[in-house]
Amino acid sequence: MIVRRALALAALALAASPALAAQERPTIVVGSPDFRPLPIAVAAFQGEGDAGVAATQTAEVVRADLVLSGLFDVLDPRGFLADPSEGFAAPSIRFARWADVGADGLAKARVRRGPAGLEGELHLYEVRAGREVLVKLLRVDGADARSLAHRMADEIVRYYTREPGIFATRIAAIRRGRGTWELVTQDMDGGNQQVLLSERSILMSPAWRPDGREILVTSYRSGRPELWAYRFSDRAFRPLGRHRNAFGGVYSPDGSRIAFTVSEGNVTDLWVMSADGVGARKLTSDPAIDVSPTWSPDGRRIAFVSDRSGTPQIYVMGADGSGARRLTFQGNYNQTPQWSPRGDLIAFTARDERKVFDVFVVSPDSGAINRITQDQGRTNEEPSWAPNGRLMIFRTDRNGGIQLVVSDARGDRQTPVTSGKTDLAAPAWGPLAP
C-alpha cells in the first residue's frame, strides 16, 4: 500500500510539473503595478486515522500564513459550496463550484501520522484551468502540526511566486524576566516559542549565522560586553574572539566574517574578524562613535551608525572600511540599520523631537526614504528583514504592551505576531529553513 501510494504521488508530481504547470501558469509578481492578491481556497484538510485534529490545525495555520504573506486573498471556508467529501484527483473535483466562490487557486491535503511524525500530502489546483498543478509529500518530526502547515504554505508560495517561502523560518529575540535575560526563538508567526538560554547577566543583539546553525549574541557574563555564540547542535554557548567591550556582532552573508563594535576608553569603532574569532582588525578610526554594522547582501559594503556629523546617522562604507559616506540627512537620531537581503533597502529606527521612535527604509544608493510606521504608539523599533526581503519584523508598543509586528516593505500591511504583553527585544529573523 505504501509503495502504491508513493508511486501514485510520483506520477502525479510528474504530470503536474513542469510541462503542465508551464501552460499559462499564474505568477504573483510582488511590486508590479497591477498586483492583486490571488484568491485562494484552502479546503478542510482530511485527517487519516487519528490525525483529524492535526489536519484541522494544519489547515488553520496554512490559511493564517497565506493571509500574513499579503500575496493571497484567502477565502472564508464558511462560504465554500463544494462537497467536502470530494476526492483529490482532478476529475473528481467540481471546479465550477470553487470558481463560483471566487477561487483561482485551491489547496487540499491529507494529514496522517507516519513512523517518525506527521506527514502531509499537499495538492494544489488551478481552478479556472481545472487542473492539478502540484503534489508534495511533506514530513515533520513529532506531532507538530504548525511546522507541517508552515512547510505547506511555503510550497504554495513557491509555486505562485517562484521564490522560497519564509513560513518555516524562526525569529530569535531577547526576553527580559525577573533578574534573567533569555535568548528565545519562535516561528515567524509567533508560535512554538523555545528558550535557548537563561542568564543572570545581560544578553543583547542576537544575530543568526547564515546557515542557521548558530546565533551570535552580546553577553555580559564577565561583567563587560563580549561576543558569544550559541550552537544548536550541542547547545554549547562559548565566547568568540578575544575582545572585551565588544558588542553588536553580525555575520557576513557568506558566514566567513563577523563585523562588530569595540569600545575602548572614549573610542568606539567597528572591527571585523573571521567567523572563528581570529584575525580581528579595525575598520573605522574616527573620534566619533561608530556602531551597529549591517552587511549588504553581496558582502561588499557595510552600513552603520555614526555621530561624526554631530547626531547619529546612517553611513555606508566598503567592507574594508573605505569610502564611508553619509546616507541619511533627515532626522537627528537614526539607528539600528538592517540591510535587506534583496539589497534595495535599509530599514532603520528614527527618533523625532517628541522622543517617538518609528521605522523607516532608505535606499542605499539614492538615499530616498519611506516611512513604515506613524502614529502607531511611541515605540516602533529594531526592524529585521525576512530572508526574502519582502517582510520585516519589529518591536512596538502600539497596543499598550510590547509586541512584535510583521510588516511588508512599504508598511501597507502590519500584523502583530505576538499576543498580549511580551517583553521581547531585538528580534532577528533567521535564514530559510533547510
UniProtKB/Swiss-Prot annotation:
Question: Where are the residues of the annotated region Disordered?
Answer: 411-434
Gene Ontology cellular component annotations, sorted alphabetically: periplasmic space
Q: Does the keyword Cell division apply?
A: yes
Which biological process, per GO, is one annotated for this protein?
Answer: cell division
Signal sequence coordinates: 1-21
Q: Which family does it belong to?
A: Belongs to the TolB family.
Protein's UniProt name: Tol-Pal system protein TolB
Supply the source organism for this entry: Anaeromyxobacter sp. (strain K)
